[in-house]
Amino acid sequence: MGWLNLEQKVAIVTGGASGIGRAICEGFAEVGVRVAVADVNGEGARQTADELRDKFGGEHIATTTDVTNKASVDAMAQAVLDAFGRLDILVNNAGINIPRLLVDPAGNEELTEKIWDRVASVNQKGVFLCAQAAARVMIKAGGGVIINMASECGMEGSEGQSVYAGTKAAVYALTRSWAKELGKYKVRVVGIAPGILEATALRSDEYERALAYTRGITVKELRERYKKATIPLRRSGRLSEVADVVCFLASDRSSYIHGTVINVSGGKSRA
């Protein structure tokens, strides 16, 4: 057994077909976890599950899951129970970001009610529905771990992405609240707040252009400023570094970590 003792555990990773989620799936598979790759992109989820089996061996499945739809989330949980008979870990990773300014005097598209509802539905409602479905299974089984994906901007705010920051701030509160509710059932609830990463869905070209625009600088200048001026380690994070923290938090090596959100930001965020 490895140091983490995660062999044969079963984990759901939402948003697992790409970006941080895919890196987490790979990190889990490498240490022997059986992974359910859940994603609204069903083909991407199936491809990821196939690649996990080819690269790491073991049993892995894919589910086409819309985290904003309760029936879809319940079907995801049932598919995992049908395949593995248990659920030990949920990683609430699925999330979206549609950057817009609240008001833009320059005439560019502003934040709209439709955008607000869409981002909040995935980033807040989705976290709630998946956590609820997983918690029901874990309570019956006598324990488990729920890991919620927050963000540094959930504590600090961020120009041009207020709705994203607001939904991620909610993840902090949900993590702490559910920890108080579920601890007595031996279900740990923790969070992770990544900072600036080398390549994720959240750090898209559109995002960088929008953020650079709000600061009146180029995208290249934006990247250099963030690395040199705001990150003490002077570099962006790697997806694998987030996955490593997830694996640790999912293991019994972190058995007394509960109700907190861990920053993975190279020192940029310290709250």
Name every feature range the model reports, one short phrase each.
Residues 136, 179-181, 255:
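Alpha-helical segment proximal to the catalytic Tyr-Lys
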Residues 101-117, 227:
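Substrate-binding pocket helix/loop in short-chain dehydrogenase/reductase
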Residues 1-5, 97, 156, 235, ...:
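Short C-terminal tail/terminal secondary-structure segment
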Residues 3-36:
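Canonical Rossmann dinucleotide-binding motif of NAD(H)/NADP(H)-dependent dehydrogenases/reductases
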Residues 151:
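Residue(s) in the substrate-gating loop at a strand-loop-helix junction
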Residues 131, 167, 175:
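Active-site helix of classical SDR
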Residues 86, 183, 188, 257-259:
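Short, small/polar-rich loop/turn modules that mediate ligand/substrate recognition or access, typified
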